[in-house]
Amino acid sequence: IVELKDSKKEKLSYNQVLFGSIVNLKSSGQIPENITMRQAVATVLDEIGNKNVQTVQIGNSIFVGTFTPEKNNMYVRVYNMDVGRNLIDNMYNYAAFLQKKGVAFVSAYIEDERLLPGLRVLQRRLEKKGTGLDVVELETGDGFGMFIKFGKQSLRKAA
């Protein structure tokens, strides 16, 4: 396992975040045992290379956003090597970035239920600015769907 790093004290490079988070996903069982580390890295690099994909690093988190056929909708995946409290700030700042770019809706798959308390904090911060965040348990029982619908009020002004 690669240790998370507080981005306020130590900023990791893009590659350090990406590879560290893949190592952690693999060691925590979130990447199946029959997938080698090399295959996992190749799959991620292939995804990032797609022309519909935009990657943004904020702190020690990398957000991989894929535009859906409706151009103002995005599906997002996070590769994280930052500590919990910073991850929530990074997510808020990424949401503000997407809102400014004209994205209206964001969805993400959340596998790790340890993120739920942090998502509730993020939800309260977004709702103060008129942006909705919902998390629903998937019927399959193997995770959660997170959905953000941006409001009119800018998230950029301090929340």
Predicted regions mapped to residue ranges:
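Acyl-donor binding region in acyl/amide transferases
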Residues: E70-T131, T140-G141
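Short amphipathic alpha-helix that is part of the acyltransferase structural core
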Residues: I1-T43, A158
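Short secondary-structure junctions
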Residues: E3, N52-V53, E127-E139
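Short loop/turn motifs at secondary-structure junctions and domain boundaries
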Residues: L45-G49
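C-terminal "cap" of GNAT-fold acetyltransferases
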Residues: D134-A159
